[in-house]
Amino acid sequence: MNGVRCGRIWLSTALAGLFSYFFVVCPRMGNAENKAEAQIDWAMAREWWAFQSPTKAELPQINQAAWPSRRIDHFVLAKLEAKKLSPSPAATKHTLARRLYLDLTGLPPTPEKMRAFLGDETDGAYEMLVEKLMQRTAYGERLASMWLNKARYAEDQAHQVGDNTAFFYPNAFKYRKWVIDAFNNDLPYDDFIRKQLAADLEKDKSVTDLPALGFIGLGHKFYNRNRLTVKAEEWSEQVDTLTRAFLGLTVACAQCHDHKYDPVTQKDYYALAGVFASTDLVDRMEDGSEIKKDSEAHKKRIGIIHIVRDTKPKDLHVFLRGNTETKGDLVKRRFLKVLAQNEPKSFTQGSGRLELAEAIADPNNPLTARVIVNRVWLIFFGRGLVATPSNFGQLGSLPSHSELLDDLAVRFMENNWSIKWLVRELVLSSTYQQNSQIISRNELIDPANIYLWRMNRRRLSVEQWRDSILAASNNLDRRGGESLELTDAKNVRRTIYGRVSRKKLSDILIQFDYPDANVHSAKRSDTTTAIQKLFIINSSFMVEQAKGLAKRITGDSSATDLTHIQSTYALLYNRQPTREETDLGLAFLRLPAEGKLTRWEQYSHALLAANEMMFVD
């Protein structure tokens, strides 16, 4: 019978989908009976595309043989031709430079850098720019902005009793720094996984990698943590973050019952939860040693890192229907059955964290490389090849270019799991270098641009947008280190170094679509609200940056207003103003000043508030 089992009855697939819509995909408490694990045909379950090992495909036949510049382009063009679509012309050098700077560093090029690139007529100038930008510290900061949301990075908890901050993370920034350095040093992604789960257990462990354990160590700590029900909530959050981030699976949906749609059983869930039940979240000195009682580090939590340690290994019983008082079978710690060729082996080394990391980073794991390749693709194209980047299961989207995704995943692993290799493949492709202009005939066939007949015009993240404004006003401070409040008027550092709170996220982050730091975020949302425009028009932050921009532009008193207007456009938008824009600016500047701001400050504010500051073509 086709459908989904719900308790003692079968629902049609359509009705099951309706059920999931109203009751959410993974309810906390199911109404199912206390029943034996549902019988799953594992061979059939492994036929799902995401559970099949990716393979390197033969290049498809294409008609426009001159268009591709990388392997990626062959797959994209073949799909376009099959859909009767044509690729767009290449973007201008100016557009490509701005796109590349913002995508790789999160900052636009300065007018001087733009002029240098536009004036460089040598072969390989674009390729050289890619390499230069990937060597900047800003590259790691840009990529880390993506990853920290996957790890639900934050520096406190969503709850606080009185003035008690014992469960807060004042040194969470050390995990952030480790992530930034990992991307800048091109740490192989399989090692990136191992170190975040088990840096303390590796054979060749280094104390410099211990902050990586913040992936687990910065998780939720609830009050009354000694109670089993509270511990179970913490384990659930850890399993959810781990499996969605690295595997693109919603395994925590199997906490109370077998997963309703994917071949993940309750036993699978408790097998993973047992790893976290055997792991403690702890504070340690930077070398991993215990903090001495009554020391400065103990009293003020200075010079410490928030990591984990193994406790006595503990296998868990299944909690029937999620009820910790109703125990079912004891489950050995192990990996997911659907991702094992036969029966998964039990974890026997301590908590099992290292074995879990190895299972995730195993090249034979069909999900890991696909998931990260798709996440990186999403960063540079605005939409993943799989539109649901943290759900590769039955309720997720099918890949738009399955052969391309698999080919990239295999080659990514063959190239030492190098993120820089992957980024290079993407940005050097003809697909990435297309312009973003609408072609009416193509739009009629593919209005959502699923098949990549043009580049997507994308809205900047809050980090890119705020940092670009600070750079334009000449106020940007490039230093890293400890976090500062984004509400602090003196904080002009890059946005990634702002404090992230689970309890009260900064207003600017909330208003401009920064994700909830309490949970793993699959991808950013793009919203347009009146509150955003009110912030842009009225906030003291924007006013101060407008003053800084006006001062920077008009510093040369010998230049004319026309020259100043041209300089402003070059600085903000990396282009020259049109005749209409020039005339409008000159007319505005001739008017008498109103209010507390000078005419140039008002003009600067208006240009900073423009939509063009928030988008990249």
Predicted feature residues:
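Primarily short, surface-exposed interaction patches in extracytoplasmic proteins
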Residues: 66-98, 103-138, 157-204, 262-265, ...
